[in-house]
């Protein structure tokens, strides 16, 4: 983006779709940013070059092809529109990227037959989008997304990658959660290109290795706020449980709690956070979040 700003000094870079009269707008997937360039500063040949690595973005065209529900979500995510009023339950985003001869109708129908609950597909680009789903007991798991990916590949001859996000409270912060998960998904595609369905737990070890210290601390602090908020006792409980190799009996004894009481707390944490701390990858993620939260007190 810096190099483009140097070439086109009248340009504006923003996190939201920015449509200005007399300007062309493009979206940079790698940085998750929009750039609006004055038409007076760019030639037709340069437009073609930019279109080879940036996605043309036009709010009118984007919205005219979408359903009312999809329009509401697109507006909320990219133009600071209001959160759709019907959203009352915790909500998650399942990000996807299609490859091959893409047929949106076929993809939508396949997802509709597979998905056990109601959802909205929001197309962000020609080959990318997000499935918006409210929380229910029938929510698709990682393995089920992998099964769907295999069906699409065998029956429709195009492949897909998924990033299964976590469930969040239905408020304005959903916009921020979407952007953060989209960045995780782009990172996952570079680091785990052959994996059809990924989660935050799966990419976290790679983030540990490749993310700058300050950015990693910020990332972990944000996750800690989501998981624990001001519940320091819950954080201590989860940390001790992991340190005791997920042994409920031993952890309960050290905390002077009844085993069933501790088991209930752990199960509720897993349900609320979407992180299975009984698994190795889930425990690793939660433990580092606990350590960061502890050190920042």
Swiss-Prot record:
Cystine pairs: none
PANTHER family: CARBOHYDRATE DIACID REGULATOR
Biological process, per Gene Ontology: positive regulation of DNA-templated transcription
Coiled coil: 128-156
Keyword Heme in record: no
Organism from which the protein derives: Bacillus subtilis (strain 168)
Gene Ontology terms, MF aspect: DNA-binding transcription factor activity
Origin: domain of life: Bacteria
UniProt keyword list: Coiled coil
Protein name: Uncharacterized protein YxkF
Gene that this polypeptide is encoded by: yxkF
Pfam families for this protein: HTH_30 (PF13556)
């Amino acid at each position: 983006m810096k190099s483009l700003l140097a070439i086109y000094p009248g340009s504006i870079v923003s996190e939201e779709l920015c449509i200005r009269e007399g300007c062309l707008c493009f979206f940079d997937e790698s940085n998750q940013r929009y750039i609006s360039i004055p038409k007076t500063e760019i030639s037709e040949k340069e437009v073609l070059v930019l279109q080879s690595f940036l996605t043309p973005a036009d709010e009118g065209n984007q919205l005219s092809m979408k359903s009312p529900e999809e329009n509401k979500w697109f507006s909320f995510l990219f133009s600071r529109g209001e959160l759709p009023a019907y959203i009352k339950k915790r909500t998650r985003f399942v990000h996807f990227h299609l490859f091959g001869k893409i047929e949106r109708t076929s993809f939508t129908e396949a997802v509709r037959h597979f998905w056990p609950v109601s959802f909205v597909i929001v197309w962000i680009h020609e080959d990318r989008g997000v499935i918006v789903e409210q929380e229910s007991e029938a929510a698709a798991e990682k393995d089920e997304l992998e099964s769907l990916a295999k069906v699409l590949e065998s029956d429709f001859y195009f492949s897909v990658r998924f990033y299964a996000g976590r469930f969040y409270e239905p408020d304005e912060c959903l916009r921020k959660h979407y952007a953060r998960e989209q960045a995780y998904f782009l990172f996952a595609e570079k680091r785990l290109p052959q994996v059809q369905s990924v989660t935050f737990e799966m990419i976290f070890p790679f983030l540990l290795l490749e993310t700058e210290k300050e950015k990693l601390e910020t990332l972990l602090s944000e996750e800690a706020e989501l998981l624990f908020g001001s519940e320091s006792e819950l954080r201590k409980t989860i940390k001790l449980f992991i340190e005791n190799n997920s042994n409920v009996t031993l952890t309960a004894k050290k905390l002077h709690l009844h085993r069933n009481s501790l088991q209930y707390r752990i199960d509720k944490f897993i349900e609320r956070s979407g992180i299975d701390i009984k698994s190795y990858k889930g425990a690793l993620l939660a433990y580092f979040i606990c350590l960061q939260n502890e050190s920042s007190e």
